[in-house]
């Protein structure tokens, strides 16, 4: 297919249509917009180079852009068995929806504190899983356990009287992680005495 020169002056810079373009919709920066795109909600600036477009701002036929035209939905969660919570910019989350979401998250947090941690990876992870340095997948497990301990230390600083992760138990983890894993220390001690 041979390339041909396009007449850029008569083509809409948004939808690339060249049927409904006229000189009235030309932006001061010389970009053109078709009538269909002109009346749709958009900012009062050129969609290509962001030059201000004063003529459109004063035109009553053009619909004004507001934040309600484009909602950005964010999804939190992502854990198996937990519904995703949707929030949008500019909208407040009512208390009932928030409590509904929190009731699904609370068991995950409590499971962390109760040592019932479940990871979504192909290796079945148990906190008393052997940590031998010559097995490659235990190095991956070692990294996970170290990040758990770092996060547990943060929780202990924020929350008092957490039995599974008391400061005395966490001090044992410091000594444990400063040494390399060996066959002598092949299990991860988690329960407090």
UniProtKB/Swiss-Prot annotation:
Q: In residue numbers, where are the RING-type zinc fingers? A: 12-50
Q: Where is the signal peptide?
A: none
Q: Which SMART domains match?
A: RING
Chloroplast: present as a keyword of the record? no
* Superkingdom of origin: Viruses
Give the GO molecular function terms: zinc ion binding
Quote the InterPro entries the UniProt record gives.
Znf_RING (IPR001841), Znf_RING/FYVE/PHD (IPR013083), Znf_RING_CS (IPR017907)
Q: Which UniProt keywords apply?
A: Metal-binding, Zinc, Zinc-finger
Which named protein is this? Putative RING finger protein ORF38
